[in-house]
Protein backbone atom coordinates (compact mmCIF):
# COMPACT_ATOMS: atom_id res chain seq x y z
CA UNK A 1 0.00 0.00 0.00
CA UNK A 2 2.83 2.40 0.87
CA UNK A 3 4.49 1.80 -2.51
CA UNK A 4 1.22 2.43 -4.34
CA UNK A 5 0.73 5.68 -2.42
CA UNK A 6 4.24 6.86 -3.20
CA UNK A 7 3.73 6.04 -6.88
CA UNK A 8 0.44 7.95 -6.94
CA UNK A 9 2.12 11.01 -5.41
CA UNK A 10 5.05 10.80 -7.86
CA UNK A 11 2.69 10.40 -10.82
CA UNK A 12 0.66 13.38 -9.63
CA UNK A 13 3.80 15.50 -9.20
CA UNK A 14 4.85 14.61 -12.76
CA UNK A 15 1.37 15.43 -14.06
CA UNK A 16 1.51 18.84 -12.37
CA UNK A 17 4.96 19.57 -13.78
CA UNK A 18 3.97 18.54 -17.32
CA UNK A 19 0.72 20.50 -17.13
CA UNK A 20 2.37 23.66 -15.81
CA UNK A 21 4.83 23.56 -18.71
CA UNK A 22 1.85 24.28 -21.00
CA UNK A 23 1.16 27.56 -19.17
CA UNK A 24 4.50 29.43 -19.13
CA UNK A 25 2.78 32.82 -18.95
CA UNK A 26 1.39 31.98 -15.50
CA UNK A 27 4.77 31.41 -13.86
CA UNK A 28 5.54 33.87 -11.09
CA UNK A 29 2.18 35.67 -11.18
CA UNK A 30 0.90 36.79 -7.81
CA UNK A 31 -2.47 35.28 -6.97
CA UNK A 32 -4.85 35.89 -4.09
CA UNK A 33 -7.42 33.20 -3.35
CA UNK A 34 -10.20 35.19 -1.73
CA UNK A 35 -13.58 34.94 -0.17
CA UNK A 36 -15.53 37.97 -1.36
CA UNK A 37 -19.23 38.14 -0.58
CA UNK A 38 -20.76 40.19 -3.40
CA UNK A 39 -23.76 40.93 -1.16
CA UNK A 40 -21.50 42.45 1.52
CA UNK A 41 -18.41 44.14 0.13
CA UNK A 42 -17.48 45.78 3.45
CA UNK A 43 -14.61 43.31 3.86
CA UNK A 44 -13.00 40.32 2.22
CA UNK A 45 -10.75 37.44 3.21
CA UNK A 46 -7.66 36.02 1.57
CA UNK A 47 -6.57 32.44 2.18
CA UNK A 48 -2.90 32.39 3.13
CA UNK A 49 -0.37 29.67 2.41
CA UNK A 50 -1.25 28.05 5.76
CA UNK A 51 -4.51 27.05 4.03
CA UNK A 52 -4.49 24.35 1.31
CA UNK A 53 -6.06 26.76 -1.21
CA UNK A 54 -3.23 29.27 -0.82
CA UNK A 55 -0.56 26.60 -0.53
CA UNK A 56 -1.77 24.90 -3.72
CA UNK A 57 -1.31 28.12 -5.67
CA UNK A 58 2.26 28.55 -4.45
CA UNK A 59 2.90 24.87 -5.21
CA UNK A 60 1.76 25.65 -8.75
CA UNK A 61 4.40 28.38 -9.05
CA UNK A 62 2.30 31.41 -8.22
CA UNK A 63 3.48 33.89 -5.62
CA UNK A 64 1.53 35.08 -2.60
CA UNK A 65 1.02 38.87 -2.65
CA UNK A 66 3.37 40.58 -0.22
CA UNK A 67 0.91 43.31 0.69
CA UNK A 68 -1.65 40.72 1.73
CA UNK A 69 0.93 38.89 3.83
CA UNK A 70 1.80 42.17 5.54
CA UNK A 71 -1.84 42.43 6.68
CA UNK A 72 -1.65 39.14 8.60
CA UNK A 73 -1.51 39.80 12.33
CA UNK A 74 -1.30 36.10 13.17
CA UNK A 75 1.35 34.50 10.98
CA UNK A 76 -0.17 31.06 11.64
CA UNK A 77 -3.71 32.01 10.60
CA UNK A 78 -5.07 30.34 7.49
CA UNK A 79 -6.68 33.55 6.26
CA UNK A 80 -6.52 37.29 6.72
CA UNK A 81 -9.65 39.43 6.79
CA UNK A 82 -9.28 42.90 5.31
CA UNK A 83 -11.60 45.88 5.42
CA UNK A 84 -12.81 47.00 2.00
CA UNK A 85 -11.27 50.44 2.59
CA UNK A 86 -7.87 48.75 2.30
CA UNK A 87 -8.71 46.69 -0.80
CA UNK A 88 -6.97 48.91 -3.36
CA UNK A 89 -3.76 49.16 -1.36
CA UNK A 90 -3.80 45.53 -0.19
CA UNK A 91 -4.44 44.06 -3.64
CA UNK A 92 -2.27 46.46 -5.64
CA UNK A 93 0.49 43.86 -6.12
CA UNK A 94 -1.95 41.05 -6.94
CA UNK A 95 -1.92 39.97 -10.58
CA UNK A 96 -4.93 37.66 -10.31
CA UNK A 97 -7.80 37.39 -7.84
CA UNK A 98 -9.61 34.08 -7.47
CA UNK A 99 -12.85 34.02 -5.51
CA UNK A 100 -15.93 31.94 -4.99
CA UNK A 101 -19.16 33.31 -6.38
CA UNK A 102 -21.59 33.27 -9.25
CA UNK A 103 -22.31 35.11 -12.48
CA UNK A 104 -23.09 38.31 -10.53
CA UNK A 105 -19.81 38.49 -8.61
CA UNK A 106 -17.64 40.29 -11.17
CA UNK A 107 -20.37 42.82 -11.97
CA UNK A 108 -20.77 43.58 -8.25
CA UNK A 109 -17.02 44.14 -7.88
CA UNK A 110 -16.85 46.34 -10.98
CA UNK A 111 -19.78 48.49 -9.77
CA UNK A 112 -18.45 48.89 -6.24
CA UNK A 113 -16.84 52.27 -5.50
CA UNK A 114 -13.79 50.68 -3.87
CA UNK A 115 -13.31 47.27 -5.50
CA UNK A 116 -13.68 48.81 -8.96
CA UNK A 117 -10.36 50.59 -8.32
CA UNK A 118 -8.45 47.38 -7.55
CA UNK A 119 -6.15 46.83 -10.57
CA UNK A 120 -7.07 43.15 -11.01
CA UNK A 121 -10.79 44.00 -10.93
CA UNK A 122 -10.43 47.03 -13.19
CA UNK A 123 -8.41 45.02 -15.72
CA UNK A 124 -10.59 41.90 -15.67
CA UNK A 125 -8.13 39.61 -13.90
CA UNK A 126 -10.67 37.97 -11.60
CA UNK A 127 -11.49 34.26 -11.69
CA UNK A 128 -14.85 33.40 -10.17
CA UNK A 129 -15.24 29.79 -9.12
CA UNK A 130 -18.87 28.70 -9.05
CA UNK A 131 -19.48 28.10 -5.36
CA UNK A 132 -21.25 24.84 -6.18
CA UNK A 133 -18.94 23.69 -8.96
CA UNK A 134 -16.10 21.22 -9.25
CA UNK A 135 -13.41 23.90 -9.46
CA UNK A 136 -14.47 25.36 -6.13
CA UNK A 137 -13.88 21.97 -4.57
CA UNK A 138 -10.72 21.29 -6.59
CA UNK A 139 -8.91 24.40 -5.38
CA UNK A 140 -8.67 22.51 -2.09
CA UNK A 141 -6.60 19.77 -3.73
CA UNK A 142 -6.10 16.12 -3.07
CA UNK A 143 -3.99 13.64 -4.96
CA UNK A 144 -7.22 12.38 -6.52
CA UNK A 145 -8.66 15.76 -7.54
CA UNK A 146 -5.54 17.18 -9.18
CA UNK A 147 -5.70 15.07 -12.33
CA UNK A 148 -9.43 15.65 -12.64
CA UNK A 149 -9.41 19.46 -12.38
CA UNK A 150 -5.91 20.96 -12.72
CA UNK A 151 -6.25 21.71 -16.44
CA UNK A 152 -9.65 23.32 -15.88
CA UNK A 153 -8.27 25.37 -12.97
CA UNK A 154 -5.27 26.60 -14.95
CA UNK A 155 -7.47 27.29 -18.00
CA UNK A 156 -9.72 29.48 -15.84
CA UNK A 157 -6.72 31.37 -14.47
CA UNK A 158 -5.05 31.63 -17.87
CA UNK A 159 -8.25 33.07 -19.37
CA UNK A 160 -7.89 36.27 -17.29
CA UNK A 161 -4.16 36.80 -17.81
CA UNK A 162 -3.49 39.68 -20.16
Task: State what each model feature region is.
Residues 1-41, 136-162:
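Extracytoplasmic substrate-binding proteins
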Residues 43-80, 134:
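Alpha-helical, coiled-coil/dimerization segments enriched in small aliphatic residues
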Residues 77-84, 111:
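N-terminal post-signal-peptidase region of extra-cytosolic proteins
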Amino acid sequence: MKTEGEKLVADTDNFIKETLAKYPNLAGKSVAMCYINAADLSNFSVYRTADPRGAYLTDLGFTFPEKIEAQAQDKNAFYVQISAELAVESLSDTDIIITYGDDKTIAALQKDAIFSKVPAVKEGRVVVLDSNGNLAAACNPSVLSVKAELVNYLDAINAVVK
